[in-house]
């Protein structure tokens, strides 16, 4: 199955900036973008508008914003970790939040990593490049996670 990054981001400007940063850094992996927490869960669990898509890929990594409409990032994370199908899925919180409590909650509920979105364009490009290369090119999933996917 092909490698996919799931970007869960409601801000259109941040979506485009992330996609542009990946392209600019030659991370050619397909990126599926969803706009809120409910749509993220629908994609990952094959429900809602994704219910009849047998070719829906399992992402190599989820880049998850925290402040999302309908269902926040922490609630998405809690549901992913509670389900055997997604408990091993790498979830990187990728957010502009600088709140200590968000970092604590992210790790408490099973985030693989917490990355603050840099404000400066060049730093943002570098952060996205590093995330894309690490999770697609370097990271090895546990064998059972590959079987569960």
Regions picked out by a protein language model, each given a short descriptive name:
Residues 2-13, 18-23, 62:
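Conserved acidic segment of CheY-like receiver
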Residues 16-20, 75, 98-113, 119, ...:
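Alpha4 helix (beta4-alpha4-beta5 surface) of REC/receiver domains from two-component response regulators
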Residues 28-35, 41-44:
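Short hydrophobic/Thr-rich beta-strand motif most characteristic of the beta2 strand and flanking loop
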Residues 33, 68-71:
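Residue-level signal for the "D+5" position in two-component response regulator receiver
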Residues 36-39, 57-60, 72-75:
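Acidic catalytic/metal-coordinating carboxylates
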Residues 39, 119-132, 140-145:
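C-terminal output helix
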Residues 49-52, 74-87:
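Short amphipathic alpha-helix used as the core "switch/output" element in two-component signaling
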Residues 65-66, 95:
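Active-site residues of response regulator receiver
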């Amino acid at each position: 199955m092909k490698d996919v990054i799931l970007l869960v981001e409601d801000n259109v400007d941040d979506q485009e900036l992330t996609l542009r940063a990946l392209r600019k850094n030659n991370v050619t992996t397909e990126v599926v973008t969803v706009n809120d927490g409910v749509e993220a869960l629908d994609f990952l669990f094959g429900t809602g508008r994704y219910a009849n898509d047998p070719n829906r890929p399992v992402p190599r990594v989820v880049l998850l914003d925290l402040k999302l409409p309908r269902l926040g990032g922490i609630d998405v994370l809690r549901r992913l970790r509670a389900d055997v199908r997604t408990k091993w899925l790498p979830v990187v919180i990728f957010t502009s939040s600088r709140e200590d409590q968000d970092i604590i909650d992210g790790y408490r509920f099973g985030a693989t990593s917490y990355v603050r979105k840099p404000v400066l364009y060049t730093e943002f490009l570098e952060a996205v490049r590093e995330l894309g290369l690490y999770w697609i090119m370097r990271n090895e999933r546990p064998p059972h996670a590959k079987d569960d996917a």
